[in-house]
Swiss-Prot record:
GO biological process: pantothenate biosynthetic process
CDD domains on file: KPHMT-like
Protein name: 3-methyl-2-oxobutanoate hydroxymethyltransferase
UniProt subcellular location: Cytoplasm
Top-rank lineage group of the source organism: Bacteria
Binding sites annotated in the UniProt record for 3-methyl-2-oxobutanoate: D46, S47, D85, K113
Length: 264
């Protein structure tokens, strides 16, 4: 039986400059498939609002939804490092964040992911002091879609320094991982090098410590708009298991994401 994957394993990957692949998972069967093929880090993302529930954003997702899918994924991948999103309006105050984090941690998560910058410092401190590990999320944060006016690249120009400052503030508050979404490669490189914690990219080029993809994008079953950073690994591989292996291999070698998947 394989040993449980911990944050220390990812920290070692960063130190040794070994890229690692992660993926979203929402149910037992796919979680088991991913674990069987060697993916040791999974995210129960609020992306399930769009991919599973059919909404046009992540905003309708509830804490109960996340807990339900977390339990299913944990059964399929008992030894993976499992991140679970706290959904929209589930962490508006530190106290609310702690209450909802407790629900998803009891459901099987190892860590909670929250979207936002320096305003979350007190929340991150409160959670980590109470043994709830935190993954930050900067750049394009889908829960803020109504503020951004759509799904747009973040961190260009002066906004890049603000994002870097936010990343450093989250790390100082105790965050142990950071997801960077849809930012220029140059900024992703600066952030990854400035932080001592592992940085996982999606639409941030191949310069981050790890990569994450929504599983539906990796299998080409997105429907409608296909994000620039996505790649259909199933098209070349022929079956799902081979597609997962190809995704991992291309991330680890730095082939994916390529220039065609990146922003500047």
């Amino acid at each position: 039986m394989s040993k449980p994957t911990t944050i220390a394993v990812l920290q070692k990957c960063k130190q040794e400059k070994k890229r690692f692949a992660t993926i979203t998972a929402y149910d037992y069967s796919f979680a088991k498939l991913f674990a069987d093929e060697g993916i040791n880090v999974m995210l129960v993302g609020d992306s399930l609002g769009m991919t599973i529930q059919g909404h046009d954003s992540t905003l309708p997702v509830t804490v109960e939804d996340i807990a339900y899918h977390t339990r299913a994924v944990r059964r399929g991948a008992p030894n993976c490092l499992l991140l679970s999103d706290l959904p929209f309006m589930a962490y508006a105050t530190p106290e609310q964040a702690f209450e909802n984090a407790a629900i998803v941690m009891r459901a099987g998560a190892n860590m909670v992911k929250i979207e936002g910058g320096a305003w979350l410092v007190d929340t991150v401190k409160m959670l980590t002091e109470r043994a709830v590990p935190v993954c930050g999320h900067l750049g394009l944060t889908p829960q803020s879609v109504n503020i951004f006016g759509g799904y747009k690249i973040q961190g260009r120009g002066d906004a890049g320094q603000i994002l870097l400052d936010d990343a450093l503030a989250l790390e100082a508050a105790g965050a142990q991982l950071l997801v960077l979404e849809c930012v220029p490669v140059e900024l992703a490189k600066r952030v990854t090098e400035a932080l001592s914690i592992p940085v996982i990219g999606i639409g941030a080029g191949n310069v981050t410590d790890g990569q994450i993809l929504v599983m539906h994008d990796a299998f080409g079953i997105t429907g409608g708009h296909i994000p620039k950073f996505a790649k259909n690994f199933l098209a070349e591989a022929g079956d799902m298991r081979a597609a997962v292996r190809q995704y991992m291999a291309e991330v680890e070698s730095g082939v994916y994401p390529g220039e065609e998947h990146s922003f500047h």
